[in-house]
Amino acid sequence: MSYIFSSESVSKGHPDKVADFIADSVLDLVLKNDPKARCAIEVALAHTTVYIFGEVSTSYILTDEIIIETAKKAIDFCGYNDEKFIFDAKSATYHVNIHKQSADIALGVDETDNKEQGAGDQGIMFGYAKDDTKELLPLPIFLAHELTKRLAFVREEGIVSGLGPDGKSQVSVLYNENHEPLEVTAIVLSTQHEASKTLESVKADMMKHVILEVIPKHLITDNTKYYINPTGRFVIGGPVGDSGLTGRKLIVDTYGGYSRHGGGAFSGKDASKVDRSASYMARYLAKQVVGSGIAKTCEIQLAYAIGVAEPVSLYVNTFGTSKVSNEVIAETISKHFDLRPKAIINYLGLTNPIFKQTTHNGHFGKLESNLSWEKLDKIEIFEQLV
């Protein structure tokens, strides 16, 4: 039975993503100066006000002034450097409330002479891979990200004038009964713009310089529908139009809804939080399975208890596409990979200040970024199972 599946992405100027980028920028700054730091940073944006709050335990002297300066650079990077869109890095108001991590949490997480490092919280995490693309991502989320990347590019490079930083995309893909993508059935693309720019010019520019530059021709048909700025006007955008908050784009950050999600956000969290580190590891493992050719798709779930090092469960599902059983794959993972938090952190190099590059256009599938969890360097372990 064929079906249509849709996924969305948002631009780097979307208020929720600006919040995420500020949080990850502060996290990277702290980790650069103290790789053992504990961070759980949240950011909220409302109109022209920026709130930065949460918990940080570090030997680095992190002042409010340093945090605000980091936030200003992050906001500028996201495109808010012009007062014509009301919200901008220089004129925004900043409020900071950062305090230390709870001693009760540290008691269960920190490594001591008598206890190994435990998980920073309980929770379930999913990783996923599918052979739709060379990035091993489902095609709808991959194309949605490509649209928002291109949208930012044409604005920043001046290819299209009169655009604002805020924007969103959505792509619908028709799949056949074997879960193979056939064609794109619908594209939604919304971009903030200056008041002087007409809807007709926005539509023409988006078709020519974004959509037709990104969507492969063989996926477009005469029946493909296009919805470009469908409300007719998108001048008020960013935090002025909608408040922004860290952790509100979980599905954009992962697999566009094609796989399940455990509910934990990524941005602002150091790797002792398994919401982030275990999700990255689960993605890495799913990629090895699919990249080895023993399955066309793979979903992996990990679950942890706070303060406990070993995962309480490991679940593998290849949805009937694998050449060996799910149980054999799970046993192979348990045999060859250490899934304790400290081991994951060391294996993936997650004490390094690498996180702000993950914030925009998804945390997965960025082959050009050389992120450790995107490498296909252990596929031989699974190739040997066949």
From Swiss-Prot:
According to its UniProt record, the EC number is 2.5.1.6
Residues annotated as binding ATP are: H14, D166, G167, K168, R233, F234, D242, R248, K249, A265, K269
Its signal peptide is: none
Hey, which pathway is this one from?
A: Amino-acid biosynthesis; S-adenosyl-L-methionine biosynthesis; S-adenosyl-L-methionine from L-methionine: step 1/1
Q: Where does Mg(2+) bind?
A: D16
Q: Which family does it belong to?
A: Belongs to the AdoMet synthase family.
**Could you tell me what this protein is called?**
S-adenosylmethionine synthase
Q: Where is this region: Flexible loop?
A: 101-111
PROSITE patterns registered for this protein in UniProt: ADOMET_SYNTHASE_1 (PS00376), ADOMET_SYNTHASE_2 (PS00377)
Q: List cellular component terms (GO).
A: cytoplasm
Subunit structure and binding partners: Homotetramer; dimer of dimers.
Q: Which organism is it from?
A: Acholeplasma laidlawii (strain PG-8A)
Is-annotated flag, keyword Transferase? Answer: yes
For biological process, the GO terms are:
one-carbon metabolic process; S-adenosylmethionine biosynthetic process
Reaction equation(s) it catalyzes: L-methionine + ATP + H2O = S-adenosyl-L-methionine + phosphate + diphosphate
Coarse class of the primary localization is: cytoplasm
The main enzyme category here is transferase
Gene name linked to the record: metK
